[in-house]
Every structure is written in structure tokens, then in C-alpha cells.
Amino acid sequence: MKQPLNFTAELVPVAYAEALLDLVAEYGVSRQALFDAARVRPEVLDSPNGRLSFLDFNQLTYSAQALCGEPALGLVLGQRLNVSAHGILGYAVLSSANLGKAIQFALKYYRVLGLAYELELVLDDGRAELRAVESMPLGAASVFAAEGLMATLYSIACFLVGEPLQDVRVGFAYPPPAHARRYAEVFGVAAEFEQPWHWLSMPSEYLERPMALANPATVQMCEQQCEALLATLDVQEGLLTRVRRLLLARPGDFPDLEQAARELHTSGRSLRRHLSSLGTTYQQVLDDVRKRLALQYLTTTQLPLYEIALLLGFNDSSNFRRAFRKWTGKLPSDYREAP
């Protein structure tokens, strides 16, 4: 069984921590002050594999936000993480034939960056939408991480096409933060909140935009290195990703924990223990999948509520309504009718 993605695994590139340290210095916070506040040893940046753990990086981000007094620090950091900050993957993206090829390469190998997200590209009605869903529970770090991810995706896309993206839209899975107006300064458009997932949408014609530095030989070399990195890091598929995929493959007929464990070739006890080490439970993962599917059905289909309830494995509409209200604070009908 592959090792589950967890908070103590050294998967986050040191380059991200260095970018954070450079940024907080501009707010008058020294490197040592940040390490002291975060209770993280400076030596973590000297790791021979060039990576640090999620736990250490999250501690640094928590303390950075507190010391800098900048609520939008995630957005600011995301704008600073240019192509070169993403290492070998960044070079491959820069050398791709066009933006579409660059995105395809990134989606194939983004796990070399130690991201705590599942990413996918959805093409529909003349638009290209990049979607991001947490592959591990980030808790209080969710907003900072999502801001950083989406801001860097947008900034790099603009850099690759050589101009600010036009007719772009962006959405986030959490309620609007107090600094929500700052999002328009970054993306050039007001963000949408309380979405089923984080997303960045642009006209699909951008995917054909050629790259000035296209180099097939460089892309091939980078692909070989990315394959080697994936094998070394063993992060091709984290445990939460595998559980979610299993549940999404069986909407309306979700397995219980023991059934899921058998399909994942492990024991129920082992699955429960691994999920606990990630700060979650099987029921919480199932509820999260149900919630995301419910939001998707309500926003993208006209299915009656009783059919949505059945698709989500509820015996009747009343149980679905109670669960949905617990998840969102709203009734399904009210959510669907909201502008």
C-alpha cells in the first residue's frame, strides 16, 4: 500500500518557505523571529531532499500571518511564486508548446510540488476551468493555501500568455473573508465564494496560445525528472484521494468503512487509523463528498430534490434536507434559488 499523504511527510519544496521568508521580511519580520514564533527549527530548510513537512510549513504560514498583520498574505505570496519557484515543473510549463499543453503537463505532475489539492481541467461551453479540491484537511490553513494556489495559477497563466487574462472568473469554496475585496486587485474581477470547489475559469481559446520559449527537448527532459521525483516521493495518490475517488465512483451506493477498506486492499482498522492520522474520519470524508456532489447537482442540474437525495444515498428528501442544512446552514431549495 502506498504511503498516505500526511502532515509530517517532507513534501513541500523549500523554495515555497524561502519565498514566504522573503515576503515577511518586507513587513519587518526577520527570519529568526518567524522561526521562533512558529517553533520551527531553521535547519528544516537544509533538508537534503530540498523539502519540508506540511506541518512545519503550516506553522510558518500561521505565524507569518500573525506577525505581518496582513490578512491577504496568501494572495500576496501566490503572486510572488513565479514559474521558477516551482522547480522542474515550472521549467516544463515554460517550455511547453502552448498554454493547453502546459496545463496538461502540470496536471500530470503537480504532485511533485507537494500540493494538498486534487486538480483537474474541465472544458465546457467555450471555457476552460481549473478546479482544486483539498486532498487532505487543511483546517485553519484552508484560506491561506487556496489564496496562494489560485493566485499563483492566475499569475503564471498571465505570464505565459504575455498579458493579463481577459474575461476571467474565479471562485472559492469558503465564505467571503473580511478582505474579500482584495481578490479583485489580484484577479481583476470580484471572486465568487461558497462554491463547490476552488476554480479559475478563462476562455478556452487561451489554451491554444503559443509559448515564446517552447522547447520539446526541455519538456522531455523535465518529464523524465518529474517521473523520477514522483517515484521518490511516492505521492502519486494520497489516501484521501483514493477514498474520495472510490466514493465518487459509486454515487448513491456508497460503501461503508469495511467495504471501502476491502476495495482499497487494507483492513477497516488500518483505514480508520490512517484517516485519523490525517485528522479526519471515514464519515467526514463521506459527508464532504456528499456535500460537494449536492452542491454540484443543485447548481448544474434541474434534478428534483428527491432524485438528488437518492443519488446521494439518502432514503428520503427530508433526511437530505436535514443533512444539507447541517453542511451549509441553508435548505437545498434556498441554495438553488439563490442568485
Swiss-Prot record:
Domain HTH araC/xylS-type: 241-338
Keyword Cytoplasm among UniProt keywords: no
SMART domains from the UniProt entry: HTH_ARAC
Hydrolase found in the keyword field: no
SUPFAM superfamilies in UniProt: Homeodomain-like (SSF46689)
GO MF term (any one): DNA-binding transcription factor activity
Protein's gene: oruR
Entry keyword set: Activator, DNA-binding, Transcription, Transcription regulation
InterPro entries per UniProt: AraC-type_N, Homeodomain-like_sf, HTH_AraC, Tscrpt_reg_AraC-type_HTH
Protein's job: Probably activates the ArgJ gene that encodes ornithine acetyltransferase. Binds to its own promoter-operator region. Probably binds ornithine.
Superkingdom classification of source: Bacteria
Gene Ontology BP term (one): ornithine catabolic process
Location of the DNA-binding region in this protein: 258-279, 305-328
Protein name: Ornithine utilization regulator
PROSITE patterns the record matches: HTH_ARAC_FAMILY_2 (PS01124)
